[in-house]
Amino acid sequence: MVDHISPRASPGPIRSSQTRRARKLRDSCTSCASSKVRCTKEKPACARCIERGLACQYMVSKRMGRNPRAPSPLDSTRRPSESLPSARSEQGLPAHNTYSTPHAHTQAHTHAHSHPQPHPQSHPQSNQPPHALPTPNGSSSVSAIFSHQSPPPPVETQGLGGDLAGQEQSTLSSLTVDSEFGGSLQSMEHGNHVDFLAESTGSLFDAFLEVGTPMIDPFLESAPLPPFQARYCCFSLALQTLTHLFPHAPLGCQLRLTDGEDSSCNLMTTDMVISGNKRATDAVRKILGCSCAQDGYLLSMVVLIVLKVLAWYAAAAGTQCTSTAAGGETNSGSCSNSPATVSSGCLTEERVLHLPSMMGEDCVDEEDQPRVAAQLVLSELHRVQSLVNLLAKRLQEGGDDAAGIPAHHPASPFSLLGFSGLEANLRHRLRAVSSDIIDYLHRE
């Protein structure tokens, strides 16, 4: 007896994974895409990621349309009855299949009886089950289509006990119709509705896992949003320093807490201004010594800190026009306890209490206090001078980096002209404060 060949072993139009196209990478790397900046498209690492020390990764771009479906691992274990010959085939009886063609039925009846029958469908055998009869609108149309596309059966398989099953299985394997689709139709026509539902659900679920699974960006997954809490870095240090330079900012603010806290104007003395500015300049020097100083936004905050330090020095020297009198009383009454009476200038101007006090280790009387304060501030301006020189160097480096970036690009807050304007503004402000103090001392 000739061994029956399994339909899974017969060669067919099996799609190979090697014929798939090579996956195409995205034009922009993950870091540039998340920052919404133009990527230089250099692989394996772009120039922007190399400059900033970031991990440059190019993700796989998702092609349009459906991906070619890979063979499911469930095909080998889904229907074992298809790969094994049936008991009726071993005993010489024809196996019934809803995909059988009229030509195959004719050969089966010719092998079972000695005389040929022209219309085997109209005279079924008595030992066949009723559900194997072809329906007028169901299996007959499908059989007609498959018989039109199927090749003639091999000659060496005719006359054997399992010839019908082998012919039908070879016919099904040579068709271009999906095997899962054919198995589902066969289950429906045989009444196996439970198997049909299980197979269709599994195939749809496999297709969803292959096509519909979204691609997760590893950069966003590895770098979640930080919680709203205090973090020690150059940005937090700059913000904290800038906040300390605005002690009167809560006055008149609509967002401040109103649970009975004191909103009176706490005036600062000359010693407090000098010590506070010294801490601010030390913090700025630490920031400029860090690699974070290459960021344009951080440099903008540092420029604001230096300008505020110069404003406090001018107020402590008495060369700035303020609303504070020599005795600490205001001429407009803008520093009352009521927030509604606080003027807009009281929130931002630097108000220093000029009273006879201890300046360093010496006690100064009321007459010599303005002159001593001006001399003390003038001796402290060298800190700001060295700080401005260091900041100008950083601004020049930031301007060189921003030279190839358009003015409207969000990678930097200022263009090349903007950075040069910041440096010119700082030097002009420093010269103005020092010249005002020198002129004041000459008049005294």
Curated annotation (Swiss-Prot):
CDD domains reported for this sequence: GAL4
Molecular function terms from GO: DNA binding; DNA-binding transcription factor activity, RNA polymerase II-specific; zinc ion binding
Compositional bias (Polar residues): 136-149
Domain of life: Eukaryota
Keyword flag Nucleus: yes
Keyword tRNA-binding carried by entry: no
Biased composition (Low complexity): 120-130
Disordered: region residues: 1-25, 64-174
Location in or out of the cell: Nucleus
Organism: Aspergillus flavus (strain ATCC 200026 / FGSC A1120 / IAM 13836 / NRRL 3357 / JCM 12722 / SRRC 167)
Pfam families registered for this protein in UniProt: AflR, Zn_clus
The entry's keywords: DNA-binding, Metal-binding, Nucleus, Transcription, Transcription regulation, Zinc
Name of the molecule in the record: Aflatoxin biosynthesis regulatory protein
Disulfide links within the chain: none
Function in brief: Transcription factor; part of the gene cluster that mediates the biosynthesis of aflatoxin, a polyketide-derived furanocoumarin which is part of the most toxic and carcinogenic compounds among the known mycotoxins. Binds to at least 17 genes in the aflatoxin biosynthetic cluster, leading to the activation of an enzymatic cascade reaction that results in aflatoxin biosynthesis. Promoter regions of several biosynthesis genes are bound by aflR in a dimeric form with a 5'-TCG(N5)CGA-3' binding motif. AflR also recognizes 5'-TTAGGCCTAA-3' and 5'-TCGCAGCCCGG-3' binding sequences.
Quaternary context: Interacts with aflS.
DNA-binding region: 29-56
